[in-house]
């Protein structure tokens, strides 16, 4: 069995993340740009015509936006964040959206 490489040239990881989101049909990403996520947002800037990035002030707001976007459009809502903050605060936004 032969395995063909997926990439023909060296590509930065942040651009690869953006490419995967674009190829998956993701149209919107909600989150905070800072720390390591700033690099992903930078990669998403190359796909700004395909993937819209909405920056929020805190993870819980991004969680609510991603949840509501998913419910209204029946497409995946993506929350971008890092570390335990996105897990804790982002999940609060999802819970809040479910209880609304």
Which residues does each PLM region occupy?
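N-terminal alpha/beta PP-like core and its mobile active-site loop of ThDP/TPP-dependent enzymes
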Residues: 1-100
